Every structure is written in C-alpha cells, then in structure tokens.
C-alpha cells in the first residue's frame, strides 16, 4: 500500500478572478509503514494537501494514486478509499455530530455497511484505545472538553480500521 502524489496542483476558485493557488506541482510518495510530518507556515497548503489524500477534494491538475490506482478514475471507489485513509480534521469539534459519544464513533463503521454489533464492538475498542472513560460514552460530545472531543474524533476514525491515519494539526488546541 502506498500513496503517491504525481505533480498535484490545487487552485481554489479556479477560472475566477479570485483564484488562489494552494498547491503547486507537488510530488510525494508515502510508502507503507512510514510516518511523515508536513511542516509549513499558516496558509502553505498542508490541510489542502491532506484533504486530497482521501479524496475529499479533487486536484486541479496532477494525479493521486492509492495502491497503484488513480483515485480520480471513474471506476475508483471513493468510499473504499475513505475507509482505508482516515482523516482527523484540525478542529475535531467540526466532525462530531451525533447525540452521544458512542453513536458518533459507531457512525463510520455503520456507514461502511457493518452490522450494528460489529460497529459497536469497533466503537468500544476505539474508545478504549484513546483512553476515554466509559462514563463518557453516552454523554453528548458537545459537553466534553477540547481534549476529550479530540479523542472522540480520533476514535471515530480508528473505529473504521484505516490502513493510513492522517492527523491534521494533531497538537493544535
């Protein structure tokens, strides 16, 4: 398994007077089993780049390959990509939405088509991995501290058992 970016560029507002180039001819290979860090100033394109890795946004030009397949090919399954390339956003409170923590963490596995029992098992295991106490499982995620929200967001991605885990600004906040 690997992720390859081949001459990827991204322009927000392409073909408008307000066009802004966020990525310019980026080529990168992330082999299986590797840890990498992206460092750059605010506005340098780090978040834009990681959103390309699981197909949340489409490159203006260039190609992105996962396991040797171009993720923008018509027959490529984005749902499968998103189950294998998990993304925890910079602000975890933006990806929490269910009425309670446990339901929030179950959402991803259920969306993959797993049974309720399997989704719940994965959610329980993921919440344990991130060290969230059992007494918080049925509280609203919006009543948690910032650090607890971050743990819930990470657990939600871990419950999908991705092959690749992307953390956007993991130490922010």
Residue ranges with predicted function:
Residues 117-135:
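Conserved ABC ATPase "signature" region
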Residues 39-41:
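The feature captures the beta-strand-to-loop junction immediately N-terminal to the Walker
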Residues 54:
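Helix-to-loop junction immediately C-terminal to a conserved catalytic motif
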């Amino acid at each position: 398994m690997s992720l390859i970016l081949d001459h990827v560029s991204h322009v927000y507002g392409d073909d408008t007077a307000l066009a802004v180039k966020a990525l310019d001819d980026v080529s990168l290979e992330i082999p299986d089993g590797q840890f990498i860090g992206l460092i750059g100033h605010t506005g340098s394109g780090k978040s834009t780049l990681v959103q390309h890795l699981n197909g949340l946004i489409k490159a203006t030009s260039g190609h992105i390959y996962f396991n040797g397949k171009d993720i923008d090919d018509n027959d490529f399954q984005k749902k499968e990509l998103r189950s294998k390339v998990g993304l925890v956003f910079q602000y975890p409170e933006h990806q929490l939405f269910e009425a309670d923590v446990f339901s929030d963490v179950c959402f991803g596995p259920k969306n993959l088509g797993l049974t309720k029992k399997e989704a719940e098992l994965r959610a329980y295991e993921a919440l344990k991995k991130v060290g969230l106490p059992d007494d918080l499982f049925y509280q609203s995620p919006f009543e948690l501290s910032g650090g607890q929200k971050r743990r819930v967001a990470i657990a939600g991605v871990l419950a999908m058992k991705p092959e690749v885990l992307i953390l956007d600004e993991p130490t922010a906040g």
